[in-house]
Amino acid sequence: ELLDKLDALRNPKMPTMLLGGLEYKMDQDGIPLKIRNVIYEYNSKGLTPLYTKKLLPNYDIFDEQKYFSAGSENSIYNFQGKSFGLLICEDMWMSSMHTTDPVKELFEEVQEKNIQLDGVINLSASPFYLGKDKTRLIRASEISQLFGCPFIYTNRVGGEDEILFDGSSFVVNGAQITHRAKFYQEDVLSYQLEAFSGELDQKKALNDKVNS
């Protein structure tokens, strides 16, 4: 339903968005064989899958391994001259319950390819509990300092049955909280990056050459 509404607004000038959603692989009878938790790029061309969640929590209220298939690939998302690492929710929380560490794997790839990320983006639907906000901020700061770039955390807001999602999305740069959304309310944050100047620099160089 949401995508139908978005498709109705789709046009060549629409902004590019990153959306969290599910990807289904069906059998011939229409029964899901695999369900993946995915980050999509959505723009005037439609939906493009970018990244599949690697860590599937299977504790407390979570039973994701029963329903979902895990991803195995890192994702470095390039957009208008900027590079971003992508993570989904649990991927930022390596623990003894998991055999892989998506943050470490992403870091190793950017080091190997000599890439300086402009940000690490995490799309989350993270339930609230007492002390969770402080724990998130500490972990976000660790990741930001590891990569030397802002950590952009976006969280679901609202309720589902007895589960509460507190929103409170934020941007952390090093040890500093630079942007903060409201708790338990829908909110919009605007975070500006330096514009990519490559195309303008090329045009300027060409103009200088023509006019010299």
State the predicted function of each range:
Residues E1-S212:
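Enzyme catalytic cores with a strong preference for nitrogen-chemistry domains
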